Amino acid sequence: DINCFHEIDSIINLSGASIFRIWTKKNKELILKSRVQSLNFLREQLIENGVKIQSIVSASGIGAYPSSDEKEFYETESDRSNYFLADVIKEWEKATSSFEIIAERVSIVRIGLVLSSMGGVLKQTMQPMSFGFGVYFGSGRQWQSWIHINDISQIFIHIIKNRLSGIYNGVAPNPITNYEFTKIISRVRKFVLFIIPVPRLFFRLIFGEMHIILFKSQRVSSKKIEQSGFNFKFPNFRSTIENILS
């Protein structure tokens, strides 16, 4: 119903099937099409009905960046990962950029690991802790760029209210290693006796190609969104976990 766009100035796009599923051919198609085709359909409907908007802000992912234990990644990074999810993100952002013909401003938010009490990566990390132990991936040295769900929600609103455009990283200012990620959660949760490393081979056997995302090391910068005037309510990982689990 095109009437749903009556008096709408801005659109926030969060559509897309979960990437945390076995990457079969069918699931790969679902992951890609749920992001790209939904945007293309929306754009075509707006064009056909002569609807102009002030802005669109669309989700994307930090999976666009390569993997590195040393390098910090900014929005201007030109190097890209060479695997399925990076290809999806390329097409996803291309579909978002196509809105430039009908929107005054187009923005993309490359989102990190979203922490929430409603599920996702935090719930998955805590599952083995119910049995008294936590696990980290391989060496545990890989960087993980995370963000509290409240902060990522506010970033989208901040971009619209401040009439921003372009690409922004949706991550908190203080990324941590996978080992520290697991250790801090286990300490806040309590009753976790020990944490153990699980070798990459195990995850490859269980998850297939999808295991790659568990071992990506991406230390992503939040400076650009901060320089635009955004203030994080949850910049610290431990206080974030305490807030969510309280």
Annotate the PLM regions:
Residues N40-N82:
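Conserved Rossmann-fold NAD(P)-dependent oxidoreductase catalytic core, especially the SDR/UDP-sugar
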Residues D1-Q37:
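NAD(P)H-binding glycine-rich loop region in Rossmannoid oxidoreductase-like domains
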Residues K90, I102-E104, L115-Q124, H158-Y168:
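Glycine/proline-rich active-site loop of Rossmann-fold NAD(P)-dependent oxidoreductases
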Residues I212-S246:
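C-terminal amphipathic/interface module of NAD(P)-dependent oxidoreductases
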Residues M126-G134, Q142-I176:
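Alpha-helical substrate-binding/gating segment
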Residues S60, K94-S117:
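Conserved beta-loop-beta element that borders a ligand/cofactor-binding pocket
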Residues R80-L85, G112-G119, S139-I147:
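Glycine-rich "substrate-gating" loop/helix at the edge of Rossmann-like oxidoreductase active sites
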